[in-house]
Amino acid sequence: MTAQIPYQHSSGYISHFHNNELDAGRGRDYNVTIKYLDDKEENIEGQAAKISHNASLHIPVLLCLVISLGGFIFGWDIGTIGGMTNMVSFQEKFGTTNIIHDDETIFVSTKKLTDLQIGLIISIFNISCGVGALTLSKIGDWIGRKGGIWFALVVYCIGITIQILSYGRWYFLTLGRAVTGIGVGVTTVLVPMFLSENSPLKIRGSMVSTYQLIVTFGILMGNILNFICERCYKDPTQNIAWQLPLFLGYIWAIIIGMSLVYVPESPQYLAKIKNDVPSAKYSFARMNGIPATDSMVIEFIDDLLENNYNNEETNNESKKQSLVKRNTFEFIMGKPKLWLRLIIGMMIMAFQQLSGINYFFYYGTSVFKGVGIKDPYITSIILSSVNFLSTILGIYYVEKWGHKTCLLYGSTNLLFYMMTYATVGTFGRETDFSNIVLIIVTCCFIFWFAITLGPVTFVLVSELFPLRTRAISMAICTFINWMFNFLISLLTPMIVSKIDFKLGYIFAACLLALIIFSWILVPETRKKNEQEINKIFEPE
């Protein structure tokens, strides 16, 4: 049995490592208990500065992109379902028979889905995503971030199978989409969380933003495939037109699942939940492009475990029981002001949807028709292309501007373009010039959303919470995002039919509220560790 020797951290904290661990930078036997610990994450500013400038981030960036691929299936569903439900073969397969009587008293039989059926098929996905995010994302604490994503991919494939085997029964198709949504909902929590915990310290914000980039890429690819299928398979009996997007879902899930094999597990999960410190050291070193023997690795582990070491002396049975009771609702009752952090996270997620972005993707088709672009498939490709290309810039600006600044700057620009859109649409005459203005404003709105609110929302929310409550807190925030997504997609057509472009003023009011809310309550989390964020909520 190897002897234990203390290692003196620069802050005065002593961690107990084995002598062979200090020599080799790795080991298997640690005398560390990691139960009921409080989180003390890395000091991003200080530690990132200490990492060698020679550290190569090519492999870490590639591995982060692999993690972010988990968002592709989310975008793929968004990009394919709208076009699928409009395909003639889809309507013939799942619709009910309608008898049409023309002027010459000839009866024509067609099959068509009702608006209610289409609404249920599309919106059930949003509801089930919210349910999956809220109820099953905790699995990431039980079997790891990677294991949780693999579980979600299996659920996703089961949902695809149900849809393919629905045999023309729209309610079975809806059930399949519900199961698929549960799987996707889990990924919307675990993928940003995994990215936040595994990204190189120097570029964490940018790497978390790649999740939104991959989502928009999935939307674009789905739109392009729909366009190809609609052009190539016009015969109502050619079910391959709507089945191909579903079959490809298997391929994406397999690619994502196999790629994750090469990604190390989250160092926070390994060290603080699984109690596997050697693997945590390896993970941190690999994802920051430094050797496992680098002093930064030891310092990072020390920072993760410091609070646990300080709490070991009070680790008796009665206090264990009190901690268990406390931890049940710690995400609300914990300090410092975790309830306020949860409210901030929920509001940011809600405001992302209330910005009106999905209104543009829904109503943009009508605007493009005004200048002769009447094909909804082409319109979708144009809008999703702007969204994807702009998100690439967002990866840079989220890190450059800072998270709160990005939120304020983005919402201010979105407010301007939403007001312009609503005013021109409401009071402008229907001319080619006004339609061109509306198209330009639409693209500008999507551009500013893609470089600010789109990526920064998940980055900021993922950094608000300590590790001990991050899973449940992010699950609740993501659930709110999905519920507002569902409500807006459900209510927008009805509201537009009543007040038309004036709906833009409602979204503008929400954006103004976001600016005020962000200015007063949202903290700047860029390059701040948990202790620094704690001081913001409880100033000493």
From Swiss-Prot:
Gene3D superfamilies: MFS general substrate transporter like domains. SUPFAM superfamilies: MFS general substrate transporter (SSF103473). The chain crosses the membrane at residues 57-76, 120-140, 147-167, 178-198, 205-225, 244-264, 358-374, 381-398, 406-426, 441-461, 479-499, 501-521. It is a multi-pass membrane protein. Residues 77-119, 168-177, 226-243, 375-380, 427-440, 500 are extracellular. The keyword Translocase does not apply. One of its GO terms (molecular function) is carbohydrate:proton symporter activity. Residues 1-56, 141-146, 199-204, 265-357, 399-405, 462-478, 522-540 are cytoplasmic. It holds the Pfam family Sugar_tr. The keyword Cell membrane does not apply. Keywords: Membrane, Repeat, Sugar transport, Transmembrane, Transmembrane helix, Transport. It is found in: Membrane. One of its GO terms (cellular component) is cell periphery. GO terms for biological process: carbohydrate transport; hexose transmembrane transport. Its main location: membrane. It comes from the Eukaryota. Belongs to the major facilitator superfamily. Sugar transporter (TC 2.A.1.1) family. Probable glucose transporter. This is Hexose transporter HXT14. It comes from Saccharomyces cerevisiae (strain ATCC 204508 / S288c) (Baker's yeast). The gene is HXT14.
